[in-house]
A protein has these predicted regions:
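S-adenosylmethionine
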Residues: 4-289
Length: 289
């Protein structure tokens, strides 16, 4: 990689510098020979520095070519994208808000809102946003970001997404940006690859299913429901979307923005190597009943 290419000469020079003067030529020759030799890695997981299970998971879900390209890209430092209001937000998160398509004066529920990036962006379109999250600490973060960006129509509310205090069919649009394995944002959280495990995905899918079901109850007839996660495992995307109950018709997200690859019934996903963005998946429905 570029990082390795840069680091090797530095490492060689540093080592030569501490060697006895009479041995420096010998040390330099040996180290540079080793540095230029082809390395036979025991596996892609070792080569790219990821847990075995994670590499296997993504290869199973996306095929070897896309999975390895994704893993390689997430070892590269991400670009910084700043909105006009000064908030730094990855393009994929902004594309999710495009799927919500919040309109002026509409009442929007962002049911897993912290840190508030999506809520403030939807408010910038003139919508009234109820930004809910499960703890005071998290809603304070939302409120602080709303104040910093001038998003005066955002109301931060402590509310558990699986036991919603809101009336059924109360909102024009609902965004369920659910907690997930975060495998699409590992370029921002490099250590997270070693903290998550396969069992965590199974636990998260149970939570995601409940969050989507409760979010669906809050949508008005004719309103829109959007489910998004910053991961691209099938278990947390297509399989969760398939649990949506009767009364909802799928909206083709690819027709709204062609950055997405097709995923399941009407959904879409983007991999980090596609658009220099985080990995993200999104599904959208209209309530017809």
């Amino acid at each position: 990689t570029g990082v390795q290419t840069c680091a090797l000469p530095i490492s060689v020079d540093a080592t030569v510098g501490i060697a006895p003067k009479r041995a420096r030529g010998f040390v330099n020759a040996i180290l540079r020979k080793v540095a230029s030799a082809d390395v036979e890695w025991p596996s892609d997981a070792v080569r790219l520095s990821y847990p075995d299970w994670l590499v296997t998971q993504l290869v199973n879900d996306h095929g070897e070519t896309d999975a390895l390209a994704m893993l390689e890209r997430m070892n590269v430092e991400p670009s910084v994208h700043e909105r006009v209001d000064g908030y730094v937000q990855d393009p994929a998160s902004q594309w999710v808000c495009e799927m919500v398509d919040a309109q002026p004066t509409e009442l929007i529920l962002d049911s897993c809102a912290a840190p508030g990036g999506k809520a403030t962006l939807m408010a910038a379109h003139g919508a009234i946003v109820v930004a809910a999250d499960r703890s005071t600490k998290r809603t304070r973060l939302v409120a602080a970001n709303a104040q910093r960006t001038g998003a005066t129509s955002v109301s931060a509310v402590v509310a558990e997404g699986t036991a919603s205090p809101f009336r059924n069919k109360a909102f024009d649009r609902v965004l369920v940006d659910a907690p997930c394995s975060g495998l699409g944002v590992l370029r921002r959280r490099a250590d997270a690859r070693w903290r998550i495990d396969a069992e965590a995905i199974e636990r998260l899918t149970k939570l995601q299913t409940k969050l989507l079901a409760h979010g669906a109850q809050a949508v008005k007839p004719g309103g829109r429901l959007v489910y998004s996660v910053c991961t691209v495992t099938r278990a947390e995307t297509c399989e969760i979307a398939a649990t949506i109950g009767e009364g909802f018709e799928s909206i083709d997200v690819l027709a709204m923005n062609d950055v997405w690859r097709p995923w399941g019934s009407g959904g879409g996903y983007v991999l980090p190597q596609d658009q220099d963005s985080d990995g993200m998946a999104v599904f959208a429905w209209q309530r017809v009943g």
